[in-house]
């Protein structure tokens, strides 16, 4: 269920702003989105796993705050990122 180091590196390479970027807002949101998607799949199979559901809600809240920050800083980057990730239809 956890992200492998290889998958994390793929996400970083796809969303990094410059060569050594590992913690920009774009990368953080992409990582959280991947974790949210995996946890959502887990919860569809394990409906009674309430502690994981609580963790999912915390991750969604964190991503929501990061998206709000990105929207304030750069609306163009925000629009590009949400369309690239396929969130907020």
UniProtKB/Swiss-Prot annotation:
One of its GO terms (molecular function) is rRNA binding. It comes from the Bacteria. The keyword rRNA-binding applies. Pfam families: Ribosomal_S15. One of its GO terms (biological process) is translation. GO terms for cellular component: cytosolic small ribosomal subunit. PROSITE patterns: RIBOSOMAL_S15. Keywords: Ribonucleoprotein, Ribosomal protein, RNA-binding, rRNA-binding. The keyword Ribosomal protein applies. CDD domains: Ribosomal_S15p_S13e (cd00353). Belongs to the universal ribosomal protein uS15 family. HAMAP family: Ribosomal_uS15_B. One of the primary rRNA binding proteins, it binds directly to 16S rRNA where it helps nucleate assembly of the platform of the 30S subunit by binding and bridging several RNA helices of the 16S rRNA. Forms an intersubunit bridge (bridge B4) with the 23S rRNA of the 50S subunit in the ribosome. Part of the 30S ribosomal subunit. Forms a bridge to the 50S subunit in the 70S ribosome, contacting the 23S rRNA. This is Small ribosomal subunit protein uS15. The gene is rpsO.
